[in-house]
């Protein structure tokens, strides 16, 4: 038995001898940064049942021959609640049996039955992706779920996070170019003519069937060899992160289809598995076991407000530089004409270099959000900000002993969709040129309102006797004590952000300040997301009353502040939500 330290990059589970086995993919920090797959057989799935009659519920559940039953005291929207923790043999048993449990007469409700097994493991074990893990284990010669020579370890002791983040990650970017004489590329007939790759591991090249006179071009025999050479590079380098731009919806689906037509092998996974494309909402998501695939296109759509999100436009906005651009509908012409082909090669290389530069600038924030939310980077990079906030709260709920509310039913969702909270107060800007302007704004207005007014579904009450904060306009009442679940969590976020900003002030190290700035920016984004998701129809902690109360207090504060300013001789020329501009007239 040995001690291991690894940076956790990816996680899933497989079934071995009818037993669910969690697989942890990472780089072994105690052994030369080698890839390693750790198998943990100790964890089992579970859900909670809220009984109407505890003894009767236990009796009915025992008849179902479940793996294990345990009575626990938890909180349900702040109320002490006795629940039964129901353990299962396998994750696939949960959807098979949960409806039978829900339908028992002695069961009022079931909870946390829709949390994926690998996410449950991360939450319960307090393990954070992109951080170092420590565990004891025994290296095995082979494992049924691994067909490569990547080291495999059977976990024999507790797996725990060290709290140390991942540094010096190996990042590889890629991009394909297609000969498209008929317009939109068609993988059934239009060949891939080059694949560019660039990384921080000293690799920068374009693979193609031509161009041997250029020193950055690696020439192969045909398209099949082109695809297999790309696969060979990914398998050999085993980057921690593989980045593309629109690679979920274009590059990888195209590569996969061309490989199938040509009979090329694309077993890129650390375990020997093929790349896998799945649906995530309205888009595709392509996964490689072990290596984290990040598509920067949806990431940039979340973080930037642009007229269009082409690679060229995003690159220019981030760096103030123009990258090489060619007309997409004429790329085939640049390939077919000898005098133009070199331009296409340089365009291909510029694409992957630009993608890599964008990744180096954007990924630190995503890595920090991964550590905060506690879910894999693969998922975080594809989550809307509201989903990130929800999974952050799910993780915190486990720590607080709170039951996680269920997702809304279709009927609940439909009834919620029509409701919209009134937004912040806006005074349209006065036309003209204004001088001697002063600006006033509230710092973290909505998060501060949530904390100061204790706005949370578990503090909302109709009780006229309780000591409450009463929302303007609506009259919603929120108990002053105890502190609600969501205000408590947001309070933690803001306190940690203040601590980090103080640490930044005291640091003279530019690199440390840069890291700390990314951390506080991630906390800021998370805190500012919280108020908005109260009114999101699919949010587990949905409460239109909370959403309306927050913006009502916001409007009240800004209007009162403007009125006070005007009493002192200021004239407001523009106001929006959490601040205003004014001129002084005396």
Swiss-Prot record:
Pfam families: DNA_pol_B, DNA_pol_B_exo1. PROSITE patterns: DNA_POLYMERASE_B. Keywords: DNA replication, DNA-binding, DNA-directed DNA polymerase, Exonuclease, Hydrolase, Nuclease, Nucleotidyltransferase, Transferase. Optimum temperature for DNA polymerase is 60 degrees Celsius, functional between 60 and 80 degrees Celsius. Exonuclease activity is higher at 70 than 50 degrees Celsius. Its EC number is 2.7.7.7. GO terms for biological process: DNA-templated DNA replication. It comes from the Archaea. DNA polymerase is inhibited by replication protein A (RPA), while 3'-5' exonuclease activity is not. Polymerase inhibition can be overcome by replication factor C (RFC) and PCNA. GO terms for molecular function: DNA binding; DNA-directed DNA polymerase activity; exonuclease activity; nucleotide binding. It catalyses: DNA(n) + a 2'-deoxyribonucleoside 5'-triphosphate = DNA(n+1) + diphosphate. PANTHER family: DNA POLYMERASE CATALYTIC SUBUNIT, DNA POLYMERASE DELTA CATALYTIC SUBUNIT. In some Methanobacteriaceae the PolB protein is split over 2 genes. Formed of a complex between PolB1 and PolB2; the exonuclease activity is associated with subunit 1. Probably binds replication protein A (RPA). In addition to polymerase activity, this DNA polymerase exhibits 3'-5' exonuclease activity. Belongs to the DNA polymerase type-B family. This is DNA polymerase PolB subunit 1. It comes from Methanothermobacter thermautotrophicus (strain ATCC 29096 / DSM 1053 / JCM 10044 / NBRC 100330 / Delta H) (Methanobacterium thermoautotrophicum).
């Amino acid at each position: 038995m040995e001690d291991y330290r690894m940076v956790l990059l990816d996680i899933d589970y497989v079934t071995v001898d009818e037993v669910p086995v969690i697989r942890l993919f990472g780089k072994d920090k105690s052994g030369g940064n080698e890839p390693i797959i750790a198998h943990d057989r100790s964890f089992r799935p579970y859900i909670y049942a809220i009984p109407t009659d505890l003894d009767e519920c236990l009796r009915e559940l025992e008849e179902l021959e479940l793996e294990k039953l345990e009575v626990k005291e938890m909180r349900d929207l702040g109320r002490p609640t006795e629940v039964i923790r129901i353990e299962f043999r396998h994750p696939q048993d949960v959807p098979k049996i949960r409806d039978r449990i829900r339908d028992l007469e002695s069961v009022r409700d079931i909870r946390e039955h829709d949390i994926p097994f690998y996410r449950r493991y991360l939450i319960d074990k307090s393990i954070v992706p992109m951080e170092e893990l420590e565990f004891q284990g025994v290296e095995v010669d082979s494992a049924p779920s691994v067909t490569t020579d990547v080291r495999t370890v059977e976990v024999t002791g507790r797996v725990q996070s060290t709290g140390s983040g991942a540094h010096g990650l190996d990042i590889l970017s890629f991009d394909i170019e297609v000969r498209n004489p008929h317009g939109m590329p068609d993988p059934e007939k239009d060949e891939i003519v080059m694949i560019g790759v660039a990384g921080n591991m000293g690799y920068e090249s374009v693979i193609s069937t031509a161009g041997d006179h250029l020193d950055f071009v690696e020439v192969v025999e045909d398209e099949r060899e082109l695809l297999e050479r790309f696969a060979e590079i990914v398998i050999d380098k085993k980057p921690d992160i593989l980045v593309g731009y629109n690679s979920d919806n274009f590059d990888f689906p195209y590569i996969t289809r061309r490989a199938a037509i040509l009979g090329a092998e694309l077993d890129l996974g650390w375990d020997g598995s093929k790349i896998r494309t799945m649906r995530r909402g309205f888009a595709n998501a392509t996964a490689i076991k072990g290596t984290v695939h990040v598509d920067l296109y949806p990431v940039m759509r979340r973080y930037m407000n642009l007229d269009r999100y082409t690679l060229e436009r995003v690159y220019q906005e981030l760096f103030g530089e123009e990258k090489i651009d060619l007309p997409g509908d004429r790329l085939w012409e640049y390939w077919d004409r000898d005098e133009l082909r070199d331009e296409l090669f340089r365009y291909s290389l510029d694409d992957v270099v630009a993608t890599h530069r964008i990744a180096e600038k954007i990924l630190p924030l995503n890595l920090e959000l991964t550590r905060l939310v506690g879910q894999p980077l693969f998922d975080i990079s594809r989550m809307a900000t509201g989903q990130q906030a929800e999974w952050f709260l799910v993780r915190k709920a486990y720590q607080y002993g709170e039951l996680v509310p269920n997702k809304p039913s279709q009927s609940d969702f439909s009834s919620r969709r029509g409701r919209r909270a009134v937004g912040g107060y806006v005074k349209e800007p006065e036309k003209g040129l204004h001088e001697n302007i002063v600006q006033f704004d509230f710092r973290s207005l909505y998060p501060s309102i949530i904390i100061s007014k204790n706005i949370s579904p578990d503090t909302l009450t109709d009780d006229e006797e309780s000591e409450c904060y009463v929302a303007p306009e609506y009259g919603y009442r929120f108990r002053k004590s105890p502190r609600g679940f969501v205000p408590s969590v947001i309070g933690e976020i803001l306190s940690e952000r203040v601590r980090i900003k103080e640490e930044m002030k005291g640091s003279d190290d530019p690199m440390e300040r840069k890291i700390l700035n990314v951390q506080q920016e991630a906390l800021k984004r998370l805190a500012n997301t919280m108020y908005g998701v109260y009114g999101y129809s699919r949010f587990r902690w949905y409460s239109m009353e909370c959403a309306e109360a927050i913006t009502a207090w916001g409007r009240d504060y800004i209007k009162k502040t403007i009125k006070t300013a005007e009493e002192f001789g200021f004239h407001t020329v523009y106001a929006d939500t959490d601040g205003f501009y004014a001129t002084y007239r005396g």
